[in-house]
Amino acid sequence: MAAEEEDEVEWVVESIAGFLRGPDWSIPILDFVEQKCEVFDDEEESKLTYTEIHQEYKELVEKLLESYLKEIGINEDQFQEACTSPLAKTRTSQAILQPVLAAEDFTIFKAMMVQKNIEMQLQAIRIIQERNGVLPDCLTDGADVVSDLEQEEMKILREVLRKSKEEYDQEEERKRKKQSSEAKMEELPVYTSEAEKMSNSQGDGEHFVQPPSEVKVHFANQSVQPLARKMELLPETSSLTQKGLKIPGLEHASMEGPIANLSALGTEELRQREHYLKQKRDKLLSMRKDTRTKQIQNTEQKGKPTREAEEMTEKPEMTAEEKQTLLKRRLLAEKLKEEVINK
């Protein structure tokens, strides 16, 4: 008894599968899906239009199945049992039964319609490419334009950085020359003041500094050449301190002139450099923004007369409906491309 029931279920499943593969089922179902799938988009939420189309599809499926089951003598209970049997759970059977299941499940129906819409978009694009040999500009993804913009921005960036470095180096060189000349002017009065103070300071019976006309230093019973020519042979400050001798002005000489201004100069230089680089950065951002805007405008305007002339001479003008359909197909093709890449 069980064997007979299994055989009956198997026969019902095979019979239904054969019907779903045949033209009596596939032709009206495919016609309906292809005509109605254009409005389905995976990004859109379920709209009232989707529900209405699903209801029409459900009525069509019920009509076709009812006509076939009545013709071969299969009742509704036998059909339900066949659909829930293990034979209908295989991958092949599920693929065949998908159009039937879509009539009862809106999620399956929507996924089926979106997939068919994408397939038709790709098919339309393929036909256009085969006919024209290349895709029109409206169907390209704009990758080349973006690449050109990026290359142009990099050229501008390198040029601005190069000019900024040259200007900064020139400015720093000018400052160094100015500071060097000022330092030389400051050294002369410092040395003169030190010589005068040393000539007035004597201690322990030793004359370290004599009148400017005969400037000599007596140290360790040795005569040294004039101070103006042999400044490096003067006694070190530490030795003078050990003898209890003080040379007014000499102990503060190391803190005067450009050496004392190093810390202040470093801070000021950093501040100026920061301000200078900020100005260049703002200038760079402005140039990049202007260039990007001009490139986009030129890209949009470029080739419009050429494309219009080619379309007028080589191809018949597209109707508004065809343009709208082509635009929708392009958007869905881009969506499919993104989904394939993300996977």
Curated annotation (Swiss-Prot):
The modification Phosphoserine is found at residues 85, 147, 201. Its main location: nucleus. Residues 147-187 form a coiled coil. InterPro entries: BART_dom, BART_sf, CFAP36. It comes from the Eukaryota. Keywords: Cell projection, Cilium, Coiled coil, Cytoplasm, Flagellum, Nucleus, Phosphoprotein. May act as an effector for ARL3. Interacts with ARL3. This is Cilia- and flagella-associated protein 36. It comes from Mus musculus (Mouse).
